[in-house]
Swiss-Prot record:
SUPFAM superfamilies: Kazal-type serine protease inhibitors (SSF100895)
Glycosylation sites: 43
Organism: Coscoroba coscoroba
GO cellular component: extracellular region
Localization, UniProt: Secreted
Database matches in InterPro entries: Bifunctional_prot_inhibitor (IPR051597), Kazal_dom (IPR002350), Kazal_dom_sf (IPR036058), Prot_inh_Kazal-m (IPR001239)
UniProt keywords, alphabetically: Disulfide bond, Glycoprotein, Protease inhibitor, Repeat, Secreted, Serine protease inhibitor
Protein name: Ovomucoid
């Protein structure tokens, strides 16, 4: 199972770095920062489906 360590999030701003991750909501996130901010916003209901685009 793929996991991402989101400790230290949310961050106020994310870089534009493109390293896509696919969330359990079937949405592609541009990078870990964007994904982790969304995880925090979801109160932990969002998880990583896999690395790369959905």
């Amino acid at each position: 199972v793929a996991t991402v360590d989101c400790s230290g999030y949310p961050k106020p701003a994310c870089t534009m770095e493109y390293m896509p991750l696919c969330g359990s909501d079937n949405k592609t996130y541009g990078n870990k920062c964007n994904f982790c901010n969304a995880v925090v916003d979801s109160n932990g209901t969002l998880t990583l489906s896999h690395f790369g685009k959905c």
